Curated annotation (Swiss-Prot):
Compartment annotation: Cellular thylakoid membrane
Recorded family membership: Belongs to the PsbE/PsbF family.
UniProt-recorded name of the protein: Cytochrome b559 subunit beta
SUPFAM superfamilies: Cytochrome b559 subunits (SSF161045)
Cofactor field: heme b
Assembly: Heterodimer of an alpha subunit and a beta subunit. PSII is composed of 1 copy each of membrane proteins PsbA, PsbB, PsbC, PsbD, PsbE, PsbF, PsbH, PsbI, PsbJ, PsbK, PsbL, PsbM, PsbT, PsbX, PsbY, PsbZ, Psb30/Ycf12, peripheral proteins PsbO, CyanoQ (PsbQ), PsbU, PsbV and a large number of cofactors. It forms dimeric complexes.
Recorded GO CC terms: photosystem II reaction center; plasma membrane-derived thylakoid membrane
Membrane topology: Single-pass membrane protein
Cofactor note (record): With its partner (PsbE) binds heme. PSII binds additional chlorophylls, carotenoids and specific lipids.
Function: This b-type cytochrome is tightly associated with the reaction center of photosystem II (PSII). PSII is a light-driven water:plastoquinone oxidoreductase that uses light energy to abstract electrons from H(2)O, generating O(2) and a proton gradient subsequently used for ATP formation. It consists of a core antenna complex that captures photons, and an electron transfer chain that converts photonic excitation into a charge separation.
Amino acid sequence: MTSGNNINQPVTYPIFTVRWIAVHTLAVPTVFFLGAIASMQFIQR
């Protein structure tokens, strides 16, 4: 039970910022364009 700290920080992948950047460089523009395209459907006269 002394290795309870290992659960909070996995030693196998200590660098999670590269994974965070890789996910958000794809997720943020995707959500932005989906929101922009969805909003265009309603502003047509």
